[in-house]
Swiss-Prot record:
GO molecular function, one term: zinc ion binding
Positions contributing to Zn(2+) binding: C24, C27, C40, C43
NCBIfam families the record matches: PRK08061.1
Purpose: Binds 16S rRNA, required for the assembly of 30S particles and may also be responsible for determining the conformation of the 16S rRNA at the A site.
Record-given protein name: Small ribosomal subunit protein uS14B
Organism phylogeny: Bacteria, Bacillati, Actinomycetota, Actinomycetes, Mycobacteriales
UniProt cofactor(s): Zn(2+)
Gene Ontology BP term (one): translation
Assembly mode: Part of the 30S ribosomal subunit. Contacts proteins S3 and S10.
Family, per entry: Belongs to the universal ribosomal protein uS14 family. Zinc-binding uS14 subfamily.
């Protein structure tokens, strides 16, 4: 889990727009966040395997 101070800092609007960044809504991780879901790759994978994300399925070809 991310530190609460860093999560709160990311939630504030930055002075300059380019300084803003996304964080995972579930765990607060700052890297590898999918904008469509608002989740990091780890949480996205866990929730997809658990069937908590409708329309997401494991690819197979």
């Amino acid at each position: 889990m991310a530190k609460k101070a860093l999560v709160n800092k990311a939630a504030r609007k930055p002075k300059f727009a380019v300084r803003g960044y996304t964080r995972c809504n579930k765990c607060g991780r700052p890297r590898a966040v999918f904008r469509k879901f608002g989740l990091c790759r780890i949480c996205l994978r866990e929730m997809a395997h658990a069937g908590e994300l409708p329309g997401v399925q494991k690819s197979s070809w």
